[in-house]
Amino acid sequence: GISSGGLGWFPDGILEHFDLVYFDQRGLGLSGELACPKAYAKDFSNYLNYDDSVGEEGYDTPAEQQDAIDEARTFVDSCVSEIGIDPARLVYYGTNQVAEDIESFRQLVGDDKFWLYGVSYGTSVAQIYAAAHADHLAGLILDGTIDLTLNGEEGALAQEKAFDEVLVATLKACDADESCAAELGGNALAAYDSLASKLAEKPIAYEYPLASGKKVKKKFTFSQLEFTASYQMYALGGRMLFLRALASANEGDMVPMARLLYQQATVDPAADEYLGDSTFSDTMFYSVNCTDDSYFSGTQEERIAQTIEAGQASNGTVPRLDGSVYTGLYCAYWPSAPKEFVTREPLTAAGV
């Protein structure tokens, strides 16, 4: 992923057969970190605490759409200013450049061929390197492969559907387990939909217990449920904890779900302060995402209009987890975003 944490994943036994070379890609950690924590914290807080009290969930009214556009513009302007970088230089922080940086490292190390291992976003880096420098690869190991033939809009919708499918499978697996089914009335899908429906109507008020022993009044929003559900789907343990939290929420106790939210969002529940994740760069997520693909083609105004239209068209096509396509609003303002679609042919790397 777009992160600085990775070496800890590998067992020591691998070193008996391979040398491991790991690096912070440019814009991360020790490689000239780009960061706008203040701008991101404000934007992220707006998202988590967003209360859509008009119409359906999503930006379905002109006022909501304009607010979303304004927030995207404000974030990008504030973020670039906080980074303190010449906006023209952001073009050098995309995945194509990361692949070329790897080639520079290979030349410095002096190996003619090497194995390239990528997980999630790392599979994009690996594929782009393979397309450009297949003659220097002994092989690729890809986990959670990203389809680079999809444009930004298609990729966002595919990701939404994948998360939704895992969520539905998790809920159905609960029904097939006697003890889990007993906790959620034998229909975990209905329990989730009921909670989502209540939150879509209005946030649920609850009291959150702090480490000090005090309790603070909080409100759990629909956006918080979508965020928590999505991030808990990444691993088996996370899915198990989500089912337990859903069972508690089904009984009127939102605290276990809130604990998962604060953990995944890296937010201090006492101060409602965004703490950030030292192994993941929120800033570089936008920089790489928007440098690699514009989501839509045309002028800035045309790309914004197409993003809103696509968001409305996708509303309801992914029943439980949607909204990723609205990242296109941020990319419409990001200085290094291309003006046209970025299209790639399926990867062919003979001999790899």
Where are these regions (language model features)?
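Alpha/beta-hydrolase fold active-site neighborhood
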Residues: 190-350
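A catalytic-pocket lid/entrance helix-loop region that shapes and gates access to the active site
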Residues: 35-53, 128-194, 231-232, 243-270
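N-terminal cap/lid subdomain of alpha/beta-hydrolase-fold enzymes
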Residues: 1-65
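Glycine-rich nucleophile elbow surrounding the catalytic serine of serine-hydrolase chemistry
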Residues: 99-100, 118-130
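Alpha/beta-hydrolase active-site loop
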Residues: 43-108
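Loop/turn elements at helix/coil->beta-strand transitions in domains of secreted/extracellular proteins
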Residues: 16-21, 26, 65-66, 73-75, ...
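Alpha/beta-hydrolase fold nucleophile elbow
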Residues: 90-91, 109-121
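Alpha/beta-hydrolase active-site loop signature
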Residues: 26-29, 80-83, 122, 146-147
